[in-house]
Amino acid sequence: MSDEQDQGETKGRLSLRPVNRGELGRTVDAGSVRQSFSHGRSKVVQVEVRKKRGGAAGAETGRPSAPSRASGGAAAPRGLTAAEQAARQRAVVEQQREAARLEAERREQEKISILSAAEEARRKAEEEARAAEEAERLRAEEEARRREEEEAERRRAAEASQATAAPPAPAAAASPRAAMPAPTAAPARPGAAPARRTAPVPPATSASETLRLRAARTGRDEEEEASRPARRPGSGAAPSRKPSVPAPKKVGDDRRRGARIDVQAALSGDDERVRSLASVRRQRDRERRQAELERLRSDQVRVVREVVLPETITVQELANRMAARVPEVVKSLMKLGVMATATQTIDADTAELVVEEFGHRSKRVSESDVELGLEGQEDSETDLKVRPPVVTIMGHVDHGKTSLLDALRSTDVAAREAGGITQHIGAYQVTLESGAKMTFIDTPGHEAFTAMRARGASVTDIVILVVAADDGVMPQTVEAIRHAKAANVPIIVAINKIDRPDANPNRVRSELLQYDIAVEAMGGETQDVEVSALKRQGLDALQEAILLQAELLDLKANPNRSAEGAVIESSLDRGRGPVATVLVQKGTLRQGDIVVAGTEQGRVRAMLDDHGQPLKDAGPSTPVEILGLSGVPGAGEVFVVVENEGRAREIAEFRQRKLREHAAAAGAAARGTLDQMLARIQAGEQKEVALVIKADVQGSAEAIQATVQKLGNDEVRVRVLLAGVGQITESDVQLAKASDAIIVAFNVRANAQARTLASRDGVDIRYYSIIYQVSDDIETMVKGKLAPIEREKFLGYAEIRQVFNITKVGKVAGCYVTEGLVKRGAGVRLLREGVVIHQGELSQLKRFKDDVREVARGYECGLSFAGFSDLREGDVVECYETETVPA
C-alpha cells in the first residue's frame, strides 16, 4: 500500500529533474523552519542551504553507494573489486587535492583584493587631503586678497570724503544719518559659530560704498548659512531665535533688490533712481586703475642705465641696450628729423641724443675697444715654470739648414722639399737623450721668403745662424743677422759643411766681424760650433750650446692660463679644411677652446703634433696643428683663446672690416684719381699683368705676391687679383677670365671642373713647384708687355751754302755734306745758330739734277724739305734715322 502511495505521489509531483538523477552536482538543499514571534504567533519559512560544488561532489563521491534495488526482487548487490576501490580512492584524493588548491587560490585572491582596496583607499585619501589643502590655501589667499581690497576701498573712500567734506558743523547737519547710533546686533543663537568681526566703517562712507559693503556682508551670511549642517529630525527642538532688528529701509532699495517690479512702482516718483551695483563696481575699478597709473607716473623711479655706444649702431640694438621699445626709439628719432627703421644704422652722435632724451647715460667707445684685455694680465713670478727653448734655424739658401735640422731630428725632411730648398716654415719638437726638449723652427733661405724669416725671428728665443764653411757669408746670411738683431735674439753660429775639402771656418769668423758678430774664438761673446750635418759631426756640441744659452735666458712661462701664441704657417686642406700651425707661447691650449687668430676665429676641433699624432692639450713652447678655424689665418698672426664665441666673432669681424678698409685705401692710392686712371687707360701709357695666385700654404702665397710685385715698372704694373691657398676652383677661373689674368698654381692643382672651364674659356693656368721659376716667368711676361724702344741713329751734317727758288718746287737748299752722310727719307732737323727750328723729313735729294738715295761726306747736294721753306744760308741740316729695339 505504501508503494502504491509513493507511486501516486510521484505521478502527481511536477519536477524538472528526473527522479533518479544523481545528487553529485546539486549545490542547494531546501527545507522549511517555523519562526516564532511574540504573543504565541509563528510562521513557516522556506530555507535554502547552499553548499560548495567541490565539497558536495566530494562528499557524494566519498559516500558509499546504496545498494540498488532490483526491479524484480531484492537481489544482493555485487561487491567492488580491489582495483575499482583503489581507483575510487585515488579519484577521491585527487578531488580533495584540487579542492585544497582552489581554496588556496581563492584566499590568495581575497588577500590581493584586500591589499589593492587598501592601497586605493590610501591613495584616494592622500589625493583628497592634497585637494583639501590646495582648496584651503586658495581660500586663504582669496580671503586675504578680499580683505586687502576692502581695506583699500575704505581708505580711498575715507580720503575722498575728507577731501570733499565741508566744515564739521555743516557736514553733521547735512548727514544726520551718520550721527545716528548703530543698531544693536541681534544676540547669537546658542551653538552657532562666533560672528566674524568686521573693521569699523568710517563715518563718512558714501552711499555707494555702503551698498557695496552691505551686499558683501549679505553674501557672506548666505554662504555661512548654507555651510551650516542641516538639523536632523528627531534631534530635539531648535533653540528659539530672537527676532533681529530690521535694517532701515532705503529709498530705491526694494526695486533694485526685488525679484520683480510692477508698472505702478516703476512710474511712481516716490523713490529716486540710483546706479546699479555693476555700474558702481565698474566705476570703482576705473578709479582704482587711474589712481594706480597716476601713482606709477608720479612715484616710479626710472632706472638710469649706462648705454655703451660704438661708432655705429642699429636702432634695434640701441633699443635693446636702453631696455626700451623700438617704436619709442623710432619716434624719438623722428623728432630729431631722422627717419630710420629698426634695422637701420645710425651714428654715435644721433644715438647719444636719443639716449639723453630717454634719461640714460651714454658711454662712447671706439670699435678697437673690442680688443681691450684680449691678451690678459701679466703672470706673477710664482706661477712661472721652466719651458723648452724655441730655436730658429736661419741662413742663406743651400747652406744646410734643413739638413742640420734633419740630423737633430734624425729624419729626412730635405729630400721631400722641391728643388732641395725649403719653401715652407716648419716647427718641430725634439726630445734629447737627457730628456730635455727643444722646439725648432726651420725658415726658408731664398730671398723671396723674407717675411717668413722675419716671423721666425720674432717668435724665437735663440737663432742658429748656419753658414757654409766653403761659401762664407752670403746676402741671406746678412739678412738673417739683421732680423735676429731687430728681434733682440741671441745668435749661435753653426759653421756647416766642415767636411768639405775647401772648408775654411776661420774665413767665416772673419767675415762675420764685418756685421758685428764676434765669436768666442775671436774674443767675442757669440758661441760658434763647427758641425757637419752630412757626417753628423758636432751635433752634441751644438745641443750643449743651445741648452747653455737657454739656461742663461731663464725661459719660463705660466701653463695654468688661457693660451696665447703665434701662427707659424697656415694652409687649406681639402679634407680637413683650414689648418694652422701654431706655437703656444703662454698658457695651455686645449681641444675645444675658442681662439681668435688674426681675422679668423673658431673652436679647436682637433690638435696634432709634428708627427701627426692627436693631442688633447699643448703647453708652452709646443708647436701644434689646429683644425676648426673659420678660414685660413695669416702667417705671423697672434692667436688668443677667448671666453665665448660671441666675442671671438666680434673681434674677427672688426679685424676683417679694418683689413678691407686698408686694402681699399691702398688700392685707391695706387690707382690715383679716377680721372688719372681713365686718362692712362685711354692713352695706353700703362699696361698691367693680372695674376691669380694659389699656393699650398699662406707663407708661399705671400712670398710669391711680394716677389712678382717687385717686377713691375712705370709702363707695366703687376696686379695680384687674389693670393690664396688651396686648389684652383671654378670661381678662380671665372675671376681670371673676367680680368684677363693668368693663374699661378704653386704646389696645387686645379679640380676637374676648373680644368674644363679653363680649357673652354682659354684661361692660362701655370703650375710651379720652385719659386724662382715663378719669378723668371712673370718677369718675361712683364717684358713682353713693354712697348718697343725707338732708338735714334745719327747719320751726318750738311751745311746750307746757297738757297734756290725753283718754280713749282719751292725753295731748294744747296748743301755741302760736312760729316757722315745724308740719306733720302731720313729724318732731319734744321739748326739755326744751334737752335732746332724745324724737324721733319727730306722730300728730295739730288746731285746735279739726278735723284740719289744718299750723299756722302765731301760732296754737294740739293735738299728739299717737306712743308717747310724758311731756309737761310749758314743753317745746318742734321740727318738721322729711327730704329726700333725690343724692350
Curated annotation (Swiss-Prot):
Chain spans, region G1: 395-402
Transmembrane regions: none
All copies of domain tr-type G, residue ranges: 386-556
UniProt keyword Protein biosynthesis present: yes
InterPro entries recorded: EF-G-like_DII, EFTu-like_2, IF2_assoc_dom_bac, IF2_II, IF2_N, P-loop_NTPase, Small_GTP-bd, T_Tr_GTP-bd_dom
GO molecular function: GTP binding; GTPase activity; guanosine tetraphosphate binding; translation initiation factor activity
Signal peptide: none
Stored CDD domains: IF2_eIF5B (cd01887), IF2_mtIF2_II (cd03702), mtIF2_IVc (cd03692)
Region span, G4: 496-499
Annotated region described as Disordered, given as residue ranges: 1-259
UniProt-annotated binding residues for GTP: 395-402, 442-446, 496-499
Annotated region described as G2, given as residue ranges: 420-424
Source taxon at top rank: Bacteria
Comp. bias regions, Basic and acidic residues: 95-111, 119-158, 250-259
Spans annotated as G5: 532-534
Bias type Low complexity, positions: 62-94, 159-210
Homology family: Belongs to the TRAFAC class translation factor GTPase superfamily. Classic translation factor GTPase family. IF-2 subfamily.
Biological role stated in the UniProt entry: One of the essential components for the initiation of protein synthesis. Protects formylmethionyl-tRNA from spontaneous hydrolysis and promotes its binding to the 30S ribosomal subunits. Also involved in the hydrolysis of GTP during the formation of the 70S ribosomal complex.
Name the record gives this protein: Translation initiation factor IF-2
Organism: Acidiphilium cryptum (strain JF-5)
Name of the gene this protein is made from: infB
